[in-house]
């Protein structure tokens, strides 16, 4: 019997055609527990559906995701509708989901929620207990698999940000039996080392089963009791474990944990330069301000200098003195002129001046001037005033 030789593409194409034309597989409803859930940046969702015995890979495209009224996650039981087809390039068959609805919670998810509630009641999640992450840790302890992608990411980020940082890698299991005990031992080891300032617990993405060791109660208590601050970077951004709630800081990925824990040398130097420039400008501004203030005070003192004030007042006094002297002279000259006129007038009318012409003045004993003969009959003695003296005479006879 002749058997035709087919290429891999021929086989995959034939299988895909067979699956696509199958009446049941072309439109089926499947229920199971979500595992290894990933929400891609494109908007598509990738996950597995599993039961006790099997699992199947699933994909839901963005157009169908946008119609969901809830966000699925690891451990959640769901019912999906879709079709079974083959991804020819990889030769992998998968369930292409068009609809999804919740169908309860899986056992692991319920166990996770139960432990989370218990530890929260014990206070292991209290924000007040969380230790401050050091800004400039020089030696960092890393607990992770020595061969996984997480340790490579952390080393690469550290080399990029600060080559002077010393990383101490504690090789540990990060999934399966004994993983949580390994991680606890790593925490104890780094706590015993005085120069270790920070601990990073890291692991790459995985299903809820693969990350389950990070939901261990003893590990949660070890993280809580650690004297050194701990950053957890477990799984992808959508993955949350118990240690993420207990740790002092949760990072969405191992790389992000390194970004948080390792300070950038370039940024550190730039910060110092910024502080230097800020200090220089502050001192410069202060000096300039003081100079301006000093110049203002100096100018103010020059204007308000007592000697300057006194000199100005002396100048004002001299001006006032000069003005007063001028006014006094004017007044005196005016008075002199007026007095001269009065004196001339008085001299012209002075009765004593007629004595120089040979006349005389007769006064009675009371110094009253006698100007009529009729006044003499009552007077017996009179004074005759001449230009060079006065003579007393006794009246003997008078003639009218």
UniProtKB/Swiss-Prot annotation:
Report any Pfam family annotated for this entry: tRNA_anti_2
Nuclease as a keyword of this entry, yes or no, is yes
Check the record and name the InterPro entries matching this protein: Exonuc_VII_L, Exonuc_VII_lsu_C, OB-fold_nuc-bd_dom
Supply the enzyme class, top level: hydrolase
> Localized where?
Cytoplasm
Q: What keywords appear on the UniProt entry?
A: Cytoplasm, Exonuclease, Hydrolase, Nuclease
The record's catalysed reaction(s) read: Exonucleolytic cleavage in either 5'- to 3'- or 3'- to 5'-direction to yield nucleoside 5'-phosphates
Q: What is its main location?
A: cytoplasm
The Swiss-Prot or TrEMBL record annotates one GO molecular function as: nucleic acid binding
Q: Which GO terms describe its cellular component?
A: cytoplasm; exodeoxyribonuclease VII complex
What protein family does this chain belong to?
Belongs to the XseA family.
Q: How does it assemble?
A: Heterooligomer composed of large and small subunits.
Give the protein's function: Bidirectionally degrades single-stranded DNA into large acid-insoluble oligonucleotides, which are then degraded further into small acid-soluble oligonucleotides.
Q: What is this protein called?
A: Exodeoxyribonuclease 7 large subunit
Name its species. Answer: Clostridium kluyveri (strain ATCC 8527 / DSM 555 / NBRC 12016 / NCIMB 10680 / K1)
């Amino acid at each position: 019997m002749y058997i035709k030789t087919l290429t891999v593409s021929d086989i995959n194409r034939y299988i895909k055609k067979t699956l696509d034309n199958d009446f049941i597989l072309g439109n089926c409803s499947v229920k199971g527990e979500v595992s290894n859930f990933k929400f891609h940046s494109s908007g598509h969702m990738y996950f597995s559906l599993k039961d006790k015995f099997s699992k199947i890979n699933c994909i839901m495209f963005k157009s169908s995701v946008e119609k969901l009224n809830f966000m699925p996650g690891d451990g959640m039981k769901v019912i999906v509708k879709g079709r079974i087809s083959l991804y020819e390039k990889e030769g992998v068959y998968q369930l292409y989901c068009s609809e999804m609805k919740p169908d309860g919670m899986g056992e692991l998810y319920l166990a996770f929620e139960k432990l989370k509630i218990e530890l929260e009641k014990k206070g292991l999640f209290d924000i007040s207990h969380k230790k401050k992450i050091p800004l400039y840790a020089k030696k960092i302890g890393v607990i992770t698999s020595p061969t996984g992608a997480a340790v490579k990411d952390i080393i690469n980020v550290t080399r990029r940000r600060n080559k002077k940082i010393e990383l101490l890698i504690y090789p540990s299991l990060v999934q399966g039996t004994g993983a949580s005990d390994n991680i606890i031992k790593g925490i104890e080891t780094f706590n015993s080392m005085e120069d270790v300032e920070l601990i990073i617990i890291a692991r790459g993405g995985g299903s809820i089963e693969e990350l389950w060791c990070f939901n261990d109660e003893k590990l949660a208590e070890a993280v809580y009791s650690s004297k050194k601050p701990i950053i957890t970077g477990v799984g992808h951004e959508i993955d949350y474990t118990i240690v993420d709630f207990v740790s002092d800081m949760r990072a969405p990925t191992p790389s992000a944990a390194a970004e948080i824990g390792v300070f950038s040398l370039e940024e550190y130097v730039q910060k110092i330069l910024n502080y230097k420039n800020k200090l220089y400008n502050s001192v410069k501004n202060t000096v300039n301000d003081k100079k301006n203030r000093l110049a203002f005070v100096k100018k103010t003192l020059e204007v308000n200098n007592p000697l300057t004030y006194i000199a100005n007042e002396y100048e004002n006094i001299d001006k006032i003195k000069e003005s007063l002297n001028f006014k006094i002279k004017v007044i005196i000259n005016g008075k002199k002129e007026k007095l001269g006129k009065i004196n001339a007038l008085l001299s012209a009318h002075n009765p004593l001046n007629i004595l120089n012409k040979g006349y005389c003045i007769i006064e009675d004993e009371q110094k009253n001037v006698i100007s009529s003969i009729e006044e003499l009959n009552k007077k017996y003695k009179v004074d005759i005033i001449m230009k060079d003296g006065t003579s007393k005479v006794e009246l003997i006879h008078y003639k009218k």
